[in-house]
Amino acid sequence: MNMSRADRIALILSLLAVVAAFLVADRIFENIAHLEDEIAYLWQAQAIARGDLTLPSPPHPHSFLVPFVVDHKGLRFGKYPLGWPVLLGIGVRLGIRNLINPLLAGLGVWLTYRLGKKIFGEAVGLLAAGLTLTSPFFLMNSGSLLSHPFGLVLSAAFALAWLDRLGPGSTSPEILPTIVAGLTLGLLALTRPWTAVAVGLPFAFHGLYLLFRGDWETRRHVLAVGGISLALGALNLLWQYAVTGDFLLNPYTLWWSYDKIGFGPGYGITKSGHNLDIAWINTRFSLFVGYRDLFGWGAYSWIFLPFGLLAVLIKRNWRGLMVGGVVASLILLYVAYWVGAWLYGPRYYYEGLYSLTLFSGVGIAFLAGWPVQPDAPWKSYSGWWQARPLALVAVLGLLVSANLLFYTPLRLQSMYGLYGMERADLQPFLTPSAQKLAPALVIVHPDQWMDYGVLLSLEDPFLDTPFIFAYTQGSKADADLASKFPDRATYHYYPDKPYTFYIGPAPGS
């Protein structure tokens, strides 16, 4: 394959993204789970790595609390659809768990470049790839154990495959892009179902248009994409049946009965249920956080987006509008979910990140007088007009430098030891003297849940690790639990007194 100079630069940016994400995972998040979601994903991944979707519920299930891992009819299983846990489980099985999201980060940057190159030309593709690489929003999520980097790759791959075969002006007769489009959207549905609906929506409108106005061959490809993605998405129903015994029982509702998409009583935590007022508050705050975390330019991360939209409309670039519509669709559809997500930026919109980086790249190129269409020639300027691109480069350089020197380091540092959870919390159990106590049941007496949650990094779902950790439920329940593990010594642990193990509850506790 012949690579252009721009392709090689994009490849370097993609490799830098892998390195940057790995460093964030290692230096900021210390390769341990912090969010409840991450803990649950790891639990599922470890179970799947050994071939299990469900496990028998342990004795005293509340003692072995794992967030978002459900006990139902004597079985224990995670509430999340299988897409991301399976991929993470492959990483666990191969011993490369900590590399999965960094590798996906690099692939996400590469696919963003490919989308930009296809729709707007190499210059915009490189701008979008560079903006992605320097985005605090991108770096935080790429260093996490969350599903969003996988979702971004699937979303971008779907958009690229759709445009390869069905985009305006496409003449490709090949079946491969059709298969890839169906598979990637279907896998996204197996990973983040509501996100898949939102990502697919702009393309669904285009697909309906093609069904009415396209030739028979085009219609076949549209129907094939829809059929493949729906067939894969329907596997969620089989998974629900496998773990709950009911095709239509969503495991989310077994943890919180109100954890559903929709409005009214029974949706969300308020008595009256989710409503448009709450939706507006959530959305507004998500966007407020988002336009700071997007590029780290303070309140001005959005500054080039209007010019990008203007350029797309002037050039009547309908492919660009479709791709740009992904983030708008995500914002619109997540109005129907009762809670927002802000700690890692507005991560429910993450799978549409390329919409924002591409449109920002188009805006920059448009203002600088650079090409914003594939194969468009570079214009030469004379006189004062020569200052136009130089001024844009200077402004962009200033913004990116300010982000990399100030905003991103501060933002990432704010995530270190999130919720007070650090790898140092595990050290009391890794000393030679502690290892001599194993195998042991450790009953944890935490001041807050996170003091217990961080220790789950040393435990697996099968409870066959040197130490297994139980959340104290009171002296009687703790004693009964200890009797269920006669082959293990029992110790009581107080996180505010590390390196000290008690053979019974501490005096005065």
Regions found by a protein language model. Name each.
Residues 36-39, 99-107, 123-162, 175-178, ...:
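Multi-pass, polyprenyl lipid-linked donor-dependent membrane glycosyltransferases
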Residues 41-42, 141-142, 148, 191, ...:
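Hydrophobic/aromatic-rich transmembrane helices and adjacent perimembrane loops
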Residues 107-110, 206-207, 213, 284-324:
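Hydrophobic, aromatic-rich transmembrane alpha-helices
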